[in-house]
Amino acid sequence: MKREIHPEYKKAKVVCACGNSFETGSTKEELKVEICSSCHPFFTGKQKLVDSGGRVEKFKRKYGLE
């Protein structure tokens, strides 16, 4: 690696939209994320079903799943 051309790697604070925050390493001082391991459905075990415009009901009617 060439000297003095790489950005400085430092501790960074990661802030999630849910309010959780933690530290990691990055070239930026602060990172803002929308979802983290504290609020992601895979890690929490809670599944969220997002129905945009009744698509789920339309699918169920189409294939007779109601």
Curated annotation (Swiss-Prot):
Q: Name one Pfam family in it.
A: Ribosomal_L31
Function noted in UniProt: Binds the 23S rRNA.
Per the entry, the cofactor note is: Binds 1 zinc ion per subunit.
The organism of origin for this protein: Natranaerobius thermophilus (strain ATCC BAA-1301 / DSM 18059 / JW/NM-WN-LF)
The record's keywords, sorted A to Z, are:
Metal-binding, Ribonucleoprotein, Ribosomal protein, RNA-binding, rRNA-binding, Zinc
Instruction: Provide the GO biological process annotations.
Output: translation
Q: Name one GO cellular component term.
A: ribosome
Q: What is the lineage of its organism?
A: Bacteria, Bacillati, Bacillota, Clostridia, Natranaerobiales
Task: Enumerate the GO terms in the molecular function aspect.
Answer: metal ion binding; rRNA binding; structural constituent of ribosome
Name of the protein in question: Large ribosomal subunit protein bL31
